[in-house]
């Protein structure tokens, strides 16, 4: 299962999974999308209906972090939990409480790469017990500009390995 919060990044990730489903790629058994506002869920439903979305999806209204916790605790083991809310980056906080029970052997992904990152801190604190893998948005952030620079300047920029790690360190110092 793959829960996500509705919004631009959430819709982009969901559409990418739809594309993979259409081409026979590896996709989750289902997706759970939560949002604090019904209007956000309705907007996502309309967009997905328009393309004939190919993956089972549940839209859940979760106006509080406790409501989001309920969506996460219901997930099966090995699920991926994504924070695409902007909480921790655009404004303080996390969509979940510190008491959230994460899926065993699951994966968390915080789209944000700077700011408070409370979601990453919560997942990291829980990572030892349920064998949770925690990812922040830094590598994703670096990949986007690196691909554009490579295309514009017709240069080869590796997307992993020592050279990529060196570029990442330079970017960290430039943004600090």
PLM regions and their residue ranges:
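Rossmann-like NAD(P)-binding element
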Residues: 31-33, 37-40, 59-96
């Amino acid at each position: 299962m793959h829960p996500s919060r509705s919004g631009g990044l959430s819709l982009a990730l969901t559409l990418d999974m739809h594309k993979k489903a259409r081409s026979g790629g590896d996709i989750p058994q289902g997706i759970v999308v939560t949002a604090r506002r019904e209007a956000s869920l309705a907007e996502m439903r309309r967009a997905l209906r328009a393309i004939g979305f190919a993956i089972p999806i549940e839209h859940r209204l979760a106006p509080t972090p406790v409501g989001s916790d309920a969506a996460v605790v219901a997930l099966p083991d090995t699920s991926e939990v994504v924070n695409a809310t902007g909480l921790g980056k655009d404004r303080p906080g996390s969509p979940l409480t510190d008491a959230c029970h994460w899926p065993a052997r699951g994966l968390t992904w915080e789209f944000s790469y700077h700011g408070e990152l409370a979601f990453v801190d919560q997942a990291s604190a829980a990572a030892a017990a349920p064998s949770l893998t925690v990812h922040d948005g830094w590598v994703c952030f670096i990949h986007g500009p690196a691909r554009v620079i490579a295309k514009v300047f017709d240069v080869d920029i590796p997307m992993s390995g020592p050279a990529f790690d060196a570029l990442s360190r330079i970017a960290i110092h430039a943004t600090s």
